[in-house]
C-alpha cells in the first residue's frame, strides 16, 4: 500500500524545524532542484493579486484636433469651456485622479478618439 499525501503532510507536521530543513536538503539533492526557485515562483502570483484599484488619467498632449479634445475633456470632467481649454493647453495635466480602472480606460479611449495622447497611471 502506498503512502497518501495526507500521511506525508502529517509526518512533516510532526517533525521539528531542523528535521524539515534536513528533509528539504535531501529532496533538493535527490531531485536536483532548489527550494529557492520554488519560493520565487510562488511569490509571483501574490504580487499579481495586489492589483491597483485607483488610477489617475493624465493628458500628455492635446494632439492636432484640440477642439475635439476640449469637448471630450468637458464631457468627461464637467468643466466649463474656459477651464477645459486651459486644462488641455496646460498638458501634461491630470484630468481625473483616483478613478476605477474601467472609468480610466473609458476616459482614455474617448480622449484618444478625439486625438489626445493620454496616460493611465
Swiss-Prot record:
Pfam families in the record: Ribosomal_L12, Ribosomal_L12_N
Keyword terms: Acetylation, Methylation, Ribonucleoprotein, Ribosomal protein
Listed result of changing residue 67 to D: EF-Tu-binding and EF-Tu-promoted GTP hydrolysis reduced
Residues modified to N6-methyllysine: 82
GO molecular function: mRNA binding; protein homodimerization activity; ribosome binding; structural constituent of ribosome
GO terms under biological process: cytoplasmic translation; translation
Post-translational modification: Acetylation of Ser-2 converts L12 to L7.
Residues bearing the modification N-acetylserine: 2
Record-linked CDD domains: Ribosomal_L7_L12
Gene Ontology CC terms, in alphabetical order: cytoplasm; cytosol; cytosolic large ribosomal subunit; large ribosomal subunit
Keyword Transmembrane helix: no
InterPro entries: Ribosomal_bL12 (IPR000206), Ribosomal_bL12_C (IPR013823), Ribosomal_bL12_C/ClpS-like (IPR014719), Ribosomal_bL12_oligo (IPR008932), Ribosomal_bL12_oligo_N_sf (IPR036235)
Alphabetical list of SUPFAM superfamilies matching this protein: ClpS-like, Ribosomal protein L7/12, oligomerisation (N-terminal) domain
Annotated segments matching region Required for recruitment of EF-Tu and EF-G, and for EF-Tu and EF-G-promoted GTP hydrolysis: 54-121
Entry keyword annotation includes Acetylation: yes
Something else known: Ribosomal protein L8 appears to be an aggregate of ribosomal proteins L7/L12 and L10.
Family the entry assigns: Belongs to the bacterial ribosomal protein bL12 family.
Alphabetical list of HAMAP family matching this protein: Ribosomal_bL12 (MF_00368)
Role played: The binding site for several of the GTPase factors involved in protein synthesis (IF-2, EF-Tu, EF-G and RF3). Is thus essential for accurate translation. Deletion of 1 of the L12 dimers from the ribosome (by deleting the binding site on L10) leads to decreased IF-2 association with the 70S ribosome and decreased stimulation of the GTPase activity of EF-G.
Record NCBIfam families: L12 (TIGR00855)
The name this protein goes by in its record: Large ribosomal subunit protein bL12
Gene responsible for this protein: rplL
Amino acid at each position: 500500500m502506498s503512502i497518501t499525501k495526507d500521511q506525508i503532510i502529517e509526518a512533516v507536521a510532526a517533525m521539528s524545524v531542523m528535521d524539515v530543513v534536513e528533509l528539504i536538503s535531501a529532496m533538493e539533492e535527490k531531485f536536483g532542484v532548489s527550494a529557492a526557485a520554488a519560493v520565487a515562483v510562488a511569490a509571483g502570483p501574490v504580487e499579481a493579486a495586489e492589483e491597483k484599484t485607483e488610477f489617475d488619467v493624465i493628458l500628455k498632449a492635446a494632439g492636432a484636433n484640440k477642439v475635439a479634445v476640449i469637448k471630450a475633456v468637458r464631457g468627461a470632467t464637467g468643466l466649463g469651456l474656459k477651464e477645459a481649454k486651459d486644462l488641455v493647453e496646460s498638458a501634461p495635466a491630470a484630468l481625473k485622479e483616483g478613478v476605477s480602472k474601467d472609468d480610466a480606460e473609458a476616459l482614455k479611449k474617448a480622449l484618444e478618439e478625439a486625438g489626445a495622447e493620454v496616460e493611465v497611471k
